């Protein structure tokens, strides 16, 4: 996981505060948030070493703002990448709003 953090940190000239670790290492990029940064800001290349590391080590079905949620906000969104993510087990959009309402959608049936 340290390799993922190093690659992402070295590739970004600016990291928004929302992606900084809010735990004991406040102000540092951590493995807890690097997956979200990757899917939100990077041009996701399914043949890259970084993509393979993220698929192997990150929780693709994390509750809250999932990697799927982040990827749908990516300006370089590509449906073929989404299909590959679904193939690797990403299966949900699971989020809560500021009032605590829970939203969940199962995406596998939406893309063929």
Swiss-Prot record:
It comes from the Viruses. Belongs to the orthopoxviruses B25 protein family. This is Truncated ankyrin repeat protein B25. The lineage of its organism: Viruses, Varidnaviria, Bamfordvirae, Nucleocytoviricota, Pokkesviricetes.
């Amino acid at each position: 996981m340290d390799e993922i953090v190093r690659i992402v940190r070295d590739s970004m000239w600016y990291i928004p505060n929302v992606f900084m670790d809010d735990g004991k290492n406040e102000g540092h990029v951590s493995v807890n948030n690097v997956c979200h940064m990757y899917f939100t800001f990077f041009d996701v290349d399914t043949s890259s070493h970084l993509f393979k590391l993220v698929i192997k080590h990150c929780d693709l079905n994390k509750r809250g703002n999932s990697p799927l949620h982040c990827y749908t906000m990516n300006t370089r969104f590509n449906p073929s990448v989404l299909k590959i993510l679904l193939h690797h087990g990403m299966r949900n959009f699971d989020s809560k709003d500021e009032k605590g309402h829970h939203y969940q959608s199962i995406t596998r049936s939406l893309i063929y």
